[in-house]
């Protein structure tokens, strides 16, 4: 299922803000509001929404695998901290190695997307 660009952006914005709140509740406060987020973050969220629409998976495994592939294509690597300039991220690991809250976040992307379309 594909969405018109304006609908895709509306869903992506809502998913982004929900994930931002989820992350903040788990101590991760480095995700800016949608209107202040860089273009690469918008693109990443749109891609996550597209993926959720194309893959009806209840858990977040395929969502994480998609994110991991996207980051690797964009030159990101595993690193001890999230650093956009250095393109390192501590969550560039297999799904089974993610903290539980991160696995639940990936499933949340799928559930939110389906609820919003």
What is each PLM-predicted segment?
Residues 1-117:
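Alpha-helical propensity feature that highlights long, continuous alpha-helices across diverse contexts
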